[in-house]
A protein has these predicted regions:
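N-terminal Sec signal peptide and the immediately downstream disordered periplasmic leader
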Residues: 1-59, 65-72, 178
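Membrane-embedded beta-strand positions in outer-membrane beta-barrel channels/transporters
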Residues: 29, 80-82, 125, 145, ...
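Soluble periplasmic/extracytoplasmic beta-strand elements of cell-envelope proteins
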Residues: 29-33, 47-52, 82-84, 98-102, ...
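Non-catalytic regulatory/gating segments with a bias toward low-complexity or hydrophobic composition
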Residues: 48, 56, 67-68, 126-131, ...
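Extracytoplasmic beta-strand/coil segments of soluble accessory domains associated
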Residues: 65-106
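Short acidic/polar hinge/loop motifs at secondary-structure boundaries
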Residues: 70, 98-99, 104-130
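A beta-strand signature from Gram-negative outer-membrane beta-barrel systems
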Residues: 108, 120-160
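Transmembrane beta-barrel wall of Gram-negative outer-membrane proteins
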Residues: 158-160, 165-196, 200, 204-242
Length: 244
């Protein structure tokens, strides 16, 4: 059955900046931190694929399955990732991943959780490093590493609300509010609510199969002065799904 999807987006920004220069048509430079320092992707001596926020939006990347279509030599399953054939052998106790996953530089024990957090909404950049990365990333990175870099709070007053509706009662709502609190302190709140009715009818008293409900709330706080920057990020997520 054809799936119908409608997208409504509302963006509220305190100011708009327009460039007087026309688009030169050149290739946009992507800055990555794969080598623990900021550098152009063209100057990075690692086999890497990177998605900045504009590319994530243009390709409509919302989950790990979407990512797999654009990453060479990579296989992604619901909770695991393999690069060049190297991944997790088994998920039982002691089954360490072969590809390390990081969110803002912090190690994540589960790729599935990190890659579905916020539906890749409000993500600044995604970096996929292919090949052994033990020198910079330590254990569990013999196959490669994946970095998710989220957007940080800033001194810009801005907000956005975005909704998507479709068949089977599918509805998704995304939104954020970024606001300065003082000259040195700012906060960013992100809310994502996604859900869909089941696609397989349950003839009993239970819910239809393959339905899901996902609620995700994030608070990001940044304090900075001329010499130091401190970022604090907290996340609360509730996810439920009726498996078929």
């Amino acid at each position: 059955m054809k799936k119908l999807t409608y997208i409504i987006s509302l963006s509220l920004v305190s100011f708009f900046a327009f460039s007087d220069d026309e688009d030169s048509g050149g290739i946009e430079e992507v800055i990555v931190t794969a080598e623990r320092q900021a550098s152009s992707i063209q100057d990075t001596a690692i086999s890497i694929t990177a998605f900045d926020e504009n590319l994530i939006e243009d390709l409509n990347l919302r989950n790990q399955e979407d990512l797999q279509n654009y990453i060479p030599a990579t296989t992604i399953q619901p909770y695991d990732i393999s690069i060049r054939g190297i991944g997790r052998m088994f998920r039982a106790l002691g089954g360490d991943p072969g590809v390390g996953t990081y969110v803002d530089g912090a190690y994540s024990v589960d790729f599935g959780i990190a890659s579905t957090d916020n539906g890749l909404y409000d993500v600044e950049r995604i970096e996929i490093l292919r090949g052994p990365q033990g020198t910079l990333y330590g254990r569990n990175s013999i196959g490669g590493a994946v970095n998710f870099i989220t957007k940080k709070a800033s001194q810009v007053q801005e907000a956005e609300i975005r909704t998507i509706v479709g068949s089977y009662g599918m509805s998704e709502a995304y939104g954020f509010l970024n606001t300065p609190l003082t000259d040195n302190l700012s906060a960013r709140v992100i809310a994502v609510n996604r859900g869909r009715d089941g696609t397989i009818k349950d003839l009993g008293a239970g819910d239809d199969l393959d339905s899901y409900q996902d609620e995700n709330y994030t608070l990001s706080i940044r304090w900075e002065n001329d010499n130091h920057t401190l970022d604090i990020r907290g996340n609360e997520r509730s996810y439920g799904r009726v498996l078929s």
